[in-house]
Amino acid sequence: MTHSPLAQFDIKKLIDIKMFGFDISFTNSSIYMLLASILALTYFYLAFYNRKLVPSRLQVSAEIVYNLVADMLNQNIGVKGHKFIPLVFSLFIFVLFSNLLGMTPYSFTATSHIIVTFTLAIIVFLTVTIVGFVKHGLRFLTLFLPYGTPLWLAPLMIVIELFTYLAKPVSLSLRLAANMMAGHVLLKVIAGFTVSLMIYLKFLPIPIIVILIGFEIFVAILQAYIFTILSCMYLNDAINLH
């Protein structure tokens, strides 16, 4: 079982903590989420603590990341979306650093666990719902009845739209967790075959591993982007009632 491709996703307790009957132990997942947050904060602190008119490469890279998130909000929501930059930016950076941290040898990918991604998705879902009711009041409920729907079809459409709305955090979290888990399992399996092939083909299989790692890094970045862009689209639905 120790050589199973799924063994890398095992949750291991590091510090056993129980409070009011709940198990809130500090695990390997906890430490990698904390580490991802610390690395992100350190990166942006080093990039911006001594900003210059002629920016350093680190500052330029941080500004590119910030502008990427700002552009996502601008394109999906417009000026009204600027107030959500702190939330959306934090989500993007946390997912991005967690995904990339999971690519390091002998590490742990927190975003491969549905409980982590579902928590992030619930934050988005609750924000969208609260913003919708605060901005539009009960008119927000018209989101569940598309304009021009015939009266006889209204009950069915309301049920379908409500189910679709409630399924958003599930699909958002499953997409991220499933992609991260599938990528790591595939990499683990192929790496195992490659080690066996090296007995006969010497160093020839190594480029295959390098290509796969490069592809997995691309997927890690892409999944952070997809999670964020979908969050922006959901916010747009609440703000502009689309």
From Swiss-Prot:
<dbReference type="InterPro" id="IPR023011">
    <property type="entry name" value="ATP_synth_F0_asu_AS"/>
</dbReference>
<keyword id="KW-0997">Cell inner membrane</keyword>
<dbReference type="InterPro" id="IPR000568">
    <property type="entry name" value="ATP_synth_F0_asu"/>
</dbReference>
<dbReference type="Pfam" id="PF00119">
    <property type="entry name" value="ATP-synt_A"/>
</dbReference>
<keyword id="KW-0813">Transport</keyword>
<keyword id="KW-0406">Ion transport</keyword>
<comment type="similarity">
    <text>Belongs to the ATPase A chain family.</text>
</comment>
<dbReference type="InterPro" id="IPR045083">
    <property type="entry name" value="ATP_synth_F0_asu_bact/mt"/>
</dbReference>
<keyword id="KW-0812">Transmembrane</keyword>
<dbReference type="GO" id="GO:0005886">
    <property type="term" value="C:plasma membrane"/>
</dbReference>
<comment type="subunit">
    <text>F-type ATPases have 2 components, CF(1) - the catalytic core - and CF(0) - the membrane proton channel. CF(1) has five subunits: alpha(3), beta(3), gamma(1), delta(1), epsilon(1). CF(0) has three main subunits: a(1), b(2) and c(9-12). The alpha and beta chains form an alternating ring which encloses part of the gamma chain. CF(1) is attached to CF(0) by a central stalk formed by the gamma and epsilon chains, while a peripheral stalk is formed by the delta and b chains.</text>
</comment>
<keyword id="KW-0375">Hydrogen ion transport</keyword>
<comment type="function">
    <text>Key component of the proton channel; it plays a direct role in the translocation of protons across the membrane.</text>
</comment>
<keyword id="KW-0138">CF(0)</keyword>
<feature type="transmembrane region" description="Helical">
    <location>
        <begin position="114"/>
        <end position="134"/>
    </location>
</feature>
<feature type="transmembrane region" description="Helical">
    <location>
        <begin position="140"/>
        <end position="160"/>
    </location>
</feature>
<keyword id="KW-1133">Transmembrane helix</keyword>
<feature type="transmembrane region" description="Helical">
    <location>
        <begin position="181"/>
        <end position="201"/>
    </location>
</feature>
<feature type="transmembrane region" description="Helical">
    <location>
        <begin position="29"/>
        <end position="49"/>
    </location>
</feature>
<protein>
    <recommendedName>
        <fullName>ATP synthase subunit a</fullName>
    </recommendedName>
</protein>
<keyword id="KW-0472">Membrane</keyword>
<keyword id="KW-1003">Cell membrane</keyword>
<dbReference type="InterPro" id="IPR035908">
    <property type="entry name" value="F0_ATP_A_sf"/>
</dbReference>
<dbReference type="GO" id="GO:0046933">
    <property type="term" value="F:proton-transporting ATP synthase activity, rotational mechanism"/>
</dbReference>
<dbReference type="GO" id="GO:0045259">
    <property type="term" value="C:proton-transporting ATP synthase complex"/>
</dbReference>
<feature type="transmembrane region" description="Helical">
    <location>
        <begin position="84"/>
        <end position="104"/>
    </location>
</feature>
<keyword id="KW-0066">ATP synthesis</keyword>
<feature type="transmembrane region" description="Helical">
    <location>
        <begin position="203"/>
        <end position="223"/>
    </location>
</feature>
